């Protein structure tokens, strides 16, 4: 069994004494740092590698913290100017994950890089902490690598903002196999197709 397998098993038992102590120490360290900061190396190398990270030039890791809880509707003085059914401000549940939010914020900070993937590293009562894997599309080491040079294509700019990363696709309900045919072509398109009555006229 390789070293990464042992790391994976350690991470799996998050309630063990070792991991609980380690997480407490790490979360204290993360709290002292900026909201978005660059990490020298991945905290979970086994997870990062499974998501596509390589310890070579052109790959960058950023760590980010996102506030936990609901998303408050940004309206001045709580005035939504609508019907009572739509007047909620506080108890609204954001339809995307905090991980997707983390990716988007890092993507805005490092606009010259492309977001490849991300993963959870820690959490406390107030924040969740994620590490985001970014790739430099201008770097020769990436452009010459047949496995990764697809991300250099301009259509992959800000893929995290368009729900094209793994967590973005998950919140869009996009996957393969049984039960996933209801989100074909997107949520709104599916709703429109299923709620539009179309009566075809046939002429001889």
UniProtKB/Swiss-Prot annotation:
One of its GO terms (biological process) is macroautophagy. Residues 165-185 are annotated as: Disordered. Component of the large ribosomal subunit (LSU). Mature yeast ribosomes consist of a small (40S) and a large (60S) subunit. The 40S small subunit contains 1 molecule of ribosomal RNA (18S rRNA) and 33 different proteins (encoded by 57 genes). The large 60S subunit contains 3 rRNA molecules (25S, 5.8S and 5S rRNA) and 46 different proteins (encoded by 81 genes). GO terms for cellular component: cytoplasm; cytosol; cytosolic large ribosomal subunit; nucleolus; nucleus. The gene is RPL15B. Present with 721 molecules/cell in log phase SD medium. There are 2 genes for eL15 in yeast. GO terms for molecular function: RNA binding; structural constituent of ribosome. This is Large ribosomal subunit protein eL15B. Component of the ribosome, a large ribonucleoprotein complex responsible for the synthesis of proteins in the cell. The small ribosomal subunit (SSU) binds messenger RNAs (mRNAs) and translates the encoded message by selecting cognate aminoacyl-transfer RNA (tRNA) molecules. The large subunit (LSU) contains the ribosomal catalytic site termed the peptidyl transferase center (PTC), which catalyzes the formation of peptide bonds, thereby polymerizing the amino acids delivered by tRNAs into a polypeptide chain. It is found in: Cytoplasm. The lineage of its organism: Eukaryota, Fungi, Dikarya, Ascomycota, Saccharomycotina. It holds the Pfam family Ribosomal_L15e. It comes from Saccharomyces cerevisiae (strain ATCC 204508 / S288c) (Baker's yeast). Keywords: Cytoplasm, Ribonucleoprotein, Ribosomal protein. It comes from the Eukaryota. Residues 169-185 have a biased composition (Basic residues). InterPro entries: Rbsml_eL15_core_dom_sf, Ribosomal_eL15, Ribosomal_eL15_CS, Ribosomal_uL23/eL15/eS24_sf. Belongs to the eukaryotic ribosomal protein eL15 family.
């Amino acid at each position: 069994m390789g070293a990464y397998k042992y790391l994976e098993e350690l991470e799996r038992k998050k309630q063990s004494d070792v991991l609980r102590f380690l997480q407490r120490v790490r979360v204290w360290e993360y709290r002292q740092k900026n909201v978005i900061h660059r990490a020298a190396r991945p905290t979970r190398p086994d997870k990062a590698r499974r998501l596509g990270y390589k310890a070579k030039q052109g790959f960058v890791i950023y760590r980010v913290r996102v506030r936990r809880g609901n998303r408050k509707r940004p309206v001045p003085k709580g005035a939504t100017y609508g019907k009572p059914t739509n007047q909620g401000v506080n108890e609204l549940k954001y339809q995307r994950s905090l991980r997707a939010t983390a990716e988007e914020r890092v993507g805005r900070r490092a606009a010259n890089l492309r977001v490849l993937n991300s993963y959870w590293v820690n959490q406390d009562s107030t924040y969740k902490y994620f590490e985001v894997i970014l790739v430099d599309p201008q770097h020769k080491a990436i452009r010459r690598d047949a496995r990764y040079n697809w991300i250099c294509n301009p259509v992959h700019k800000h893929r995290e903002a368009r729900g094209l990363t793994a967590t973005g696709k998950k919140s869009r309900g996009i996957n393969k196999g049984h039960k996933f045919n209801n989100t074909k072509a997107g949520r709104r398109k599916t709703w429109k197709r299923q709620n539009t009555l179309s009566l075809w006229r046939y002429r001889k």
